[in-house]
Regions:
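Walker B catalytic acidic pair
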Residues: 94-98
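Short, conserved "post-DEAD/DEAH" coupling segment immediately C-terminal to helicase motif II
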Residues: 102-122
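Conserved P-loop NTPase catalytic core
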Residues: 36-41, 49-54, 59-64, 68-81, ...
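Amphipathic alpha-helical
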Residues: 16-28, 219
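Conserved RecA-like helicase motor-core motifs
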Residues: 26-36
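Extracytoplasmic/secreted cell-surface and envelope-processing proteins
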Residues: 12, 100-101
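Conserved Walker A/P-loop ATP-binding site and its immediately adjacent core
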Residues: 1-21
Length: 219
């Protein structure tokens, strides 16, 4: 399942990211798929339905046994009760730090958390990534969810208060333009230019770059 800060954002992630990956799978990796090759709402990895014809019934023709994954990838509109009553193997929560009123990420997580469980058994996982809005525009709820996900603070069942584990990745670890050809971040300004993935020189470190940005904003 896919959720984002708005329905159109979830749809865009599905159509622009998920579907092209499926389309470009090598044929020997691609599961059997039902429906269109570029769907707008759901990727259905199941065996397409076949019609029962009079000829098949009269001749008692045996249907070819083909197995599929019997699973789907879809997206939902943003709302507190999105995916209510469903069971999921994976939920991708995109831009979860930017849910503005009247939607509330805390309310939605109380619902979707149950989609990943059967009683006490965990049957699915959630990947919830985001930068954060201002506190009064969804950031406060996301902040609470983040601090409720401290892996060092667990209840008697071994789970955090939220059921998630928090992971903070600082901006400088993955800032475009400051990653060298080996995939490592260039923190400090190098003595001689490093080389980026595209062969372009990196003459400045990301920390110095952002220090200059901050200084430029001072009145």
């Amino acid at each position: 399942g896919i959720l984002s800060k708005s329905g159109p954002d979830a749809k865009k992630m599905f159509t622009d990211k998920v579907v092209p990956i499926s389309v470009n799978y090598p044929f020997f990796f691609k599961p059997i798929q039902d429906g269109m090759d570029r769907p707008k709402t759901e990727l259905a990895y199941r065996v397409p339905a076949s019609k029962f014809t009079r000829k098949k019934l009269d001749t008692n023709e045996k249907l070819q046994e083909i197995t599929g994954l019997d699973t789907t990838i879809d997206w939902k509109n943003t709302g507190d009760n999105s995916y209510d009553g469903e069971k999921l193997k994976l939920l991708v929560h995109d831009e979860s730090g930017k849910w503005e009123r009247p939607t509330n990420i805390l309310n939605n997580w109380r619902v979707t958390k149950t989609c990943l469980r059967l009683g006490s058994k965990i049957i699915g996982k959630c990947m919830m990534g985001s930068t954060s809005n201002a506190l009064d525009k969804g950031g406060e709820n996301f902040k609470k969810l983040y601090y409720d996900s401290d892996a060092t603070k667990r209840n008697a069942n071994g789970q955090t208060r939220s059921g998630l584990y928090s992971l903070f990745i600082p901006m400088e670890w993955n800032y475009e333009g400051y990653i060298d050809s080996f995939g490592f971040p260039v923190f400090e300004t190098p003595k001689k230019p490093a080389e980026g993935p595209d062969g372009s020189p990196i003459r400045q470190g990301v920390i110095e770059y952002w220090t200059n940005e901050v200084e430029g904003l001072k009145g």
